[in-house]
Amino acid sequence: MTSGIYYKGLQCWIPDEQSQWIPGSIKDCRVEGEKAFLTVQDENENETVITVKPDDLNYEGRNGLPFLRSINSDADDLTDLSYLNEPSVLDALSTRYNQLQIYTYSGIVLIAVNPFQRLPNLYTHEIVRAYSEKSRDELDPHLYAIAEDSYKCMNQEHKNQTIIISGESGAGKTVSARYIMRYFASVQALIQSTDSNFHEAPQLTAVENEILATNPIMEAFGNSKTSRNDNSSRFGKYIQILFDGNATIIGAKIQTYLLERSRLVFQPNQERNYHIFYQILAGSSSEQLEKWKLVENSQEFNYLKQGNCSTIEGVNDKEEFKATVDALKTVGIDNDTCECIFSLLAALLHIGNIEVKHSRNDAYIDSKNENLINATSLLGVDPSSLVKWLTKRKIKMASEGILKPLNEFQAVVARDSVAKFLYASLFDWLVATINKALMYSADKSNQTAKSFIGVLDIYGFEHFKKNSFEQFCINYANEKLQQEFYRHVFKLEQEEYAAEGLNWSYIDYQDNQQCISMIESRLGILSLLDEECRMPTNSDENWVSKLNDAFSKPEFKNSYQKSRFGNKEFTIKHYALDVVYCAEGFIDKNRDTISDELLELFTNSDVPFVKDLVLFRLEQTAPPADTKKIKTKPKSNTLGSMFKSSLVSLMSTINETNAHYIRCIKPNEEKEAWKFDNQMVVSQLRACGVLETIKISCAGFPSRWTFDEFVSRYYMLVPSAVRTTESLTFSKAILEKHADPTKYQIGKTKIFFRSGVTPLLESARDKALKHAAHLLYEAFAVNYYRTRFLLSRKRVRSFQAVAHGFLSRRHTEYELLSSNIIKLQSLWRTALKRKEFIQTKNSILKVQSIIRGFLLRQTLEEKTKHDATLIIQSLWLTFKAHKHYKELQYYAVRIQSLWRMKLAKRQLTELKIESTKASHLKQVSYRLESRLFEISKQLDNSEQENNKFRERIAELESHLSNYAEAKLAQERELEQTRVLISDQSQDGELKELLEEKENALIMMEEEMRQVNDANTELLRVNATLKSQLKNYDMIIVEQTSQLKEKNRIIASLTKATKILNSASSIEQSRNSEEKSRRDSSLMEMRTQKEMLVLLMNDGLKHDLDKLTEYAGRTFTTLKTLLLKDNDVEAQKLDHLFLAKLLFIIISQMWKSNLCQESVALVERYCVHTLEYVFQKTSSANERPDIGFWVANTHALLAFVYTKQQAFKHSSAFTLLSTESHESVQTIFEMIESHLSKIFFEWVRQVNNFLKPLIVQAMIITGTNTDAGDENRKLRIKFFEKPKYKITDVIHVLNKVHDSCQAYKVNYEIYNALIRSIYRFINVEAFNSLFIDERGSWKRGTNISYNYHVLKDWCLESGVPEAYLQLEELLQTSKILQFVKDDPNYVARVRDFYALNFLQIKTLLHRYDYADYEAHVPKKTMSELSKNIVAEGINQREQLTYEVLDYRLQDSFEESPSLEKIKIPDDCNVTYLRRIIDLASAEESVEQALITVGNVADNDVQNSSDEENQVPNGIKV
């Protein structure tokens, strides 16, 4: 039998000496009569039996019962723990700390556990943006959440705020305060620059920089290294950040409390003096050190070497000194004043080195001591006077004064008092100067502070082996703050109970008012201390004796305890623990002053800074009534009384503000990163009051649930018939059945439970779930086994049917096989017999054929022999007849040859006689050769001229048609010009232009007539030449037969003559073309003159502006036409006409040497385009399609690049000036930069449009609209479905794709655009999982589904590499879908290269588990944390976004053709039209000249080829 809240299997905590608490479980719980036995088993399987009364089982932790373990051990808020007890709180903090989560809420308190490692990624400006304008519960616990909460409360409630940061030394208070101040400064800059990029740090104002500059100053002069902390604040400070009515920072004010002055003259082992001294020695120049008589080695100074620690690991004192000097300048302290400050600090180091000797019983200081001289020279005082008043004291007796020598100890105390006095004065002066600078900023801006947010960075509770006056004051301040904290928590509890309408009674809690009254009352400890200080013969022992007499009464037994051994110690029972104080030095530290003589000495210092510093100190410490009496020392306040009054003022300020609490925890004494010491943390939780706060909460209603949360957790405790969608009714039904009405109360929005109710509900929930699981198992088992039976029966029957069929088929097959075998046997026998018959028959036939063949061959052989005999006989007879014929033929030929020889000899004799006639034959030969040469030359010339005339005729006919069209265009333009002149009444310059145009027309007509005449003449000459050619051919044929013997020589001479005649023909052709070129040059000069006038006219600029505006109005229509494939309209509106026209104008300017004007023109185009693009984006209905401007700008860039390359490879480029070269390059760079700006604006607009869609479309929705939310509320309520889906994102991407297709945007730009958009989707969706949303298994499937949708779109749209930008999302989806309790989980996630371990751990930490899911084991989280530390803790959680740039290829498009450019008809741009027409005409003329030049070049080339064809062996 079980009873109460304890039952078998319940998780609990078991006390342990080393770890405080270890996890365990209840093995058995039984009640036997008047006793209850609880068997508890720890994690090592050690069992313990606890015997209690049965009634004790209803109360957690009573009479040795174990505390219960919470289900959610890593809750963000400790008050959300299922069981609010000390071990659960400790376990929650330890679990989060091991998961690298250093911040945890505990109700209104933020607990910050020091990681002892820099975490810069936790405080970036992206994190500032994330927490800005968010409520505290929306995001993970953070310093910025507390800061934002205070900022929001100040704006909404119009009430001043205070953030109280407390904790012991080394807990991280200073760093926390620093980051809070940085947050306020950064969030102000963020609000004032809402359009800044998400990943760019906001720009701070001068006031905000000054406020942030106070941190390095105060840390340098007020912080030091201690055994517990490398940067321990040795003073308390309260910084008020002032805001005006618009919640804008206008200034600040700093208040300090109790500077530890004794640290200046003494430091314990391994501790340092204040940072500023080490910074001066490390950061000052050699000249400065020489000036101040210092050396770099700090061990040379008595005030710096006592702690045997001169450096801090990881801290560069030289760099810190530079930062301190810069901060001093930021707050308005000039270089001269800085020199004075450092000179004073150097003097203090020299004072510490002044050696005090003893002479008998008196102290002695050598007046020639080097350190004394250095100190007095820097302080501007007389060395002998300083020595006098350090070794003697003046005792006033009535009207006289007596000088009393001091002993060595007293002189050292006097020396150290001077140093402490001067340093404390300097510190207070710095604070006042900083306040004056910060308030000056507010006065200068003529603004009044309406509210403030105070940041209190004050020392935490301290307890050392030896506790002195400083620890007493610090603990006194913590008593006051703790009391205020208790009241604040109690007040919030009361306010919440009242707001919810609960019936509640007074909650009893520990009040430390008695301890505070004992310290600060009229007859309290501080008053008795001040009284003892005023006594002539005072001592610490006398003071302790008075304390014992006053507080040894019974009413102070809970606050005070006297020492058992003498009057040197006393004990105060503080709220945290009892502290034993050593009374030695209390009186001297409380007085904290120097003699009047020393004050007068420094008041009369020769150094103005030292003098002003002492006077400032006297004014600050003197009572108000005596402030004017400076030369005589007034009755000054003691340090204890001043601290008490400042503390009372501080508490009054805090009471008037809304307080926010941050408790800093030091996790271990060794300052080792990520080490959690349970015992040390528990002691601090007790000291800072967190556990006491939990006790206060437990005394009332420690557990509270909203209706929806309660129903979603415990809906299974009532039958389904009782369930309703109204959560309040549903909650009441659950409570009536399972809870005692006295143990809970129902408020307006929440249900409040007393201690012990939650375990009962959890027990009932476990039972209900087990019962439901049992029912489900029964139903599943019945269904499972019935299904198995039916399936088995079906399979048996199927097997039987198969077996029957198999046997039947087998019998049938046997019968068929037997029948077939018989048939086969008969067929086989038949085949054998047939085979034997065929073989016999074939043998007989073969024998017969052999015999017949033998007989036939024998007959054939006899016939062959007979025929051969006849052939041999005929061949022999033939041979004999042929031989006789050859003999007769030989003799006949011989006779003929002899006769011919005789005739030849006779003819030779005749030729010798005629040899005298040779000269005559040569002359005839020469005339024939000359005639042949002339005929050959005329033939070649005729052929060449004929070819040239044919080409010229074709060319002139083409030009004739072009000139006709040009004439019509000129006449229309001339008519327009006349109308323009008549309408605008222009001056004589336009008339002259008109006359020139008319003359040009007349010249063109004259040239056309000449061309026609030339054409007729050419036709006539061609006919004549053809007839002559025929005659020449006949002559050549006749004379060729007469000159065959000398053909080789004649051919060579003819070739040489042809080469000379060809050169003469080319010269004549060039002379004929010269006149045509002169005429063309004249016309070109007139065209250039008119072009120059138009390019210099301002009307061109206005035309370009009109054209830009026209493009802006009509490009969306163009895209619509292009998408509809309307070819006719699309051809009318060329989407690149703007770029082409602008390039033509730029080209004409370059030709006219107007390079600077072209730069101005391009700049004008860029400015107007950007104005249009940026201004029009404010209207959603008229959103510009930037694809048009991107396409035109890229086309213009391509045209300019092509022209630039053409210039570089032409001779004209070398003729341009250096300024022209620079102008061309400037235009290219300007257009390239302009293209980049438009591209980035395009990306920005698309991203802004997608931003509100991404989270819902990528994470919350997936395969169905309800897919994203794992919240169990969906089981009982219907919420509004997500607004956006992935189809909405695809719709935006389709628009971008259509725009790029419509305007034919360059592929590289299109690729970069899509990749940038995908990168933005990836970054926004991924970062939302670390800020606003939580991951879950279902959301992992949603992300995976949406990823593949976007991937498919990429593949379809021609950018297959864009989906690689979503790699982080893809791997995130896999992590969310992995089984969380997999023992190899860490090994599996190592393959995710796109994510670091910090991101993986954060995803798991923020994972929203469903009821059926197993949680990630602590071992896995610890292993992930170890990997994070091993790889470096400074990993980034969130991704940063950058627009991906495009990579333009070097191969651009070629320059546009003028024939393809058409200005829209409805665009009134007169000047621009005329420029295009002139450029078109110029291009036509240039093309014609190029054609004529090519013809002449071809002629020269042909002649050259003929020269090279001279036969071998002939010399020309």
From Swiss-Prot:
ATP binds at G167, E168, S169, G170, A171, G172, K173, T174. Involved in cell wall deposition where it has a role in the localization of mok1. GO terms for cellular component: actin cortical patch; actin cytoskeleton; cell cortex of cell tip; cell cortex of growing cell tip; cell division site; cell tip; cortical dynamic polarity patch; cytoplasm. Residues 1163-1431 form the Dilute domain. It comes from Schizosaccharomyces pombe (strain 972 / ATCC 24843). One of its GO terms (biological process) is protein transport to mating projection actin fusion focus. Residues 926-1034 form a coiled coil. Residues 647-669 are annotated as: Actin-binding. One of its GO terms (molecular function) is ATP hydrolysis activity. Residues 793-813, 818-838, 840-865, 866-886, 888-917 form the IQ domain. The keyword Repeat applies. It holds the Pfam family IQ. Residues 73-766 form the Myosin motor domain. Residues 7-62 form the Myosin N-terminal SH3-like domain. Keywords: Actin-binding, ATP-binding, Calmodulin-binding, Coiled coil, Cytoplasm, Motor protein, Myosin, Nucleotide-binding, Phosphoprotein, Repeat. InterPro entries: Dilute_dom, IQ_motif_EF-hand-BS, Kinesin_motor_dom_sf, Myosin_head_motor_dom-like, Myosin_N, MYSc_Myo5, P-loop_NTPase. Belongs to the TRAFAC class myosin-kinesin ATPase superfamily. Myosin family. This is Myosin-52. The keyword Coiled coil applies. The gene is myo52. The modification Phosphoserine is found at S1065, S1072. It is found in: Cytoplasm.
